[in-house]
Regions:
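Structural preference for solvent-exposed beta-strand-turn elements
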Residues: 1-174
Length: 174
């Protein structure tokens, strides 16, 4: 696999996907990010409960896929690279390199086959909502989301779709 893209694009994708990657997992691949290069590049983070992927434009010289280091470390590495074109390459021997300007990092990658597949989203259950409306819903209910980790069921919001109406409920347990 080999591709090149603007640093800010890859950095944004890595930052987004890193939010879903597992910090500690018995499946070591879940601590990293799955990078897939084809017509563009997809960066995926997944912890078996939540998954985030982001597609970016890139010049793909050699299609392929691999799992690159821990998400946290990869995110930090992206932050330290100078602005410009980043080239990511993973050879058949699983040696990976990331180059940008005068900076170059080398490390070992894991095979993409080690990364569990994200469940497919059922498009029949999809909802389209404007960013402004969703932001308003979140702003009006976020205060009620619990931060108490001993009761994780209250650490999120419930979205219900009934008769074309989307309702969002947040509760902190009180």
């Amino acid at each position: 696999m080999k591709f090149s893209c603007e640093k800010h694009l890859l950095q944004a994708a890595v930052a987004a996907a890193s939010r879903a990657a597992s910090a500690k997992s018995p499946i070591s691949a879940l601590e990293g990010l799955l990078i897939e290069a084809g017509s563009g590049v997809r960066v995926t983070g997944y912890d078996l409960k939540k998954g985030i992927y982001m597609n970016i434009e890139a010049d793909v010289a050699q299609p392929g896929s691999a799992v690159l280091m821990t998400a946290k470390l990869f995110s930090e590495m992206m932050r330290l690279l100078p602005d410009g074109i980043v080239t990511v390459e993973v050879g058949d021997d699983s040696r990976a390199s990331v180059r940008c300007g005068q900076s170059e990092y080398g490390f070992m990658a894991l095979p993409a086959a080690d990364y569990p597949e994200l469940p497919e989203v059922d498009e029949s259950e999809a909802v389209r909502i404007s960013q402004k409306a969703l932001r308003s819903m979140i702003d009006e209910s976020i205060f009620a989301v619990s931060t108490n980790e001993s009761r994780p069921v209250y650490m999120g919001s419930l979205f219900e779709l009934e008769g074309g109406r989307l309702t969002m409920v947040s509760v902190d347990g009180y």
